[in-house]
Amino acid sequence: MDDGIVSYGEHPLNRLKFFQFDKSNDVTLLLIHGGAWRDPNNTYNDFKDMISHIQKNQYAAKYNLIAMNYRLSPEVKHPFHLWDVLEGLQFLVQNYDIHKISIAGHSVGATLMLQLLDYNKILDTGFQILVEDSKADKNRTETDLHVPSKKERILMNEAMEKLQLRTFCFIDGIYDITQLISEYGCPYESFVNNAFSSPEQYAEATQLSSSTVDVGSPFSYNTHSANVRNELNLVILQSNKDELLSMRQTNLFIEYLTQKNLNFKPFVGEWGGHEHVYRHEDVANIVLDSI
């Protein structure tokens, strides 16, 4: 482990950074950065300030604090960002015996967390559309795209069954990509098109706009989805000073969770702009108090 950095895959961005780890700790906090699926300036180091704030607390030593990188667009498109997150989790289960986990994600990091809660459906639809779009465009095959095999998917499900999801903290997230483009137009459509193969694919990429995920059903994370419904602590944070994302995405997410009859805790505060909110001490304290 070089400076707390370990590889969970072959790509240079398939990396985890262990800010704090003790194998005797029972609970792990995993942090997932944003950056519109494409910005190399957003990395696991985004969370240095949050980690520092958390470590001031006298009880912080009992938590493992880990952040992750994942492959970016346009090198890869959805759902490979989600697959990377899953591979990172699988790596932690298999190599560090981590089972109880809380996750906090910023911006598209929060998107990835939402996708995780229905990951099999999101992967199935995402890869299906990606393969169809790629064939139509470049006559590429499923093998060329390195779509995970059936065996890889089975092994992934086995690893995910061993995880107990405790708390998800969504920080200034994107939850409905179709509505995001409707609100902001061309500038946002540009980075979305970098990350997705077609409008159909990004419409199916999250539960809020998907035609295949039933809004009335519990999250289908795994066979223990009822436990996810009953035990997962959902926390939604939004800075009212965010210049890149208005309250609309957060309000849409709150409406969606309400339709699902799921409990959640919303927090809104003056925590600065989009790239400052996750650095704010108040946000760090909410995350720590929630896990």
From Swiss-Prot:
InterPro entries: AB_hydrolase_fold, BD-FAE-like_dom, GDXG_lipolytic_enzyme, KFase_ver/fungi-typ. Transmembrane segments: none annotated. A motif (HGGXW) lies at residues 33-37. GO terms for molecular function: arylformamidase activity. It catalyses: N-formyl-L-kynurenine + H2O = L-kynurenine + formate + H(+). It comes from the Eukaryota. Belongs to the kynurenine formamidase family. HAMAP family: KFase. This is Kynurenine formamidase. It comes from Debaryomyces hansenii (strain ATCC 36239 / CBS 767 / BCRC 21394 / JCM 1990 / NBRC 0083 / IGC 2968). The lineage of its organism: Eukaryota, Fungi, Dikarya, Ascomycota, Saccharomycotina. The gene is BNA7.
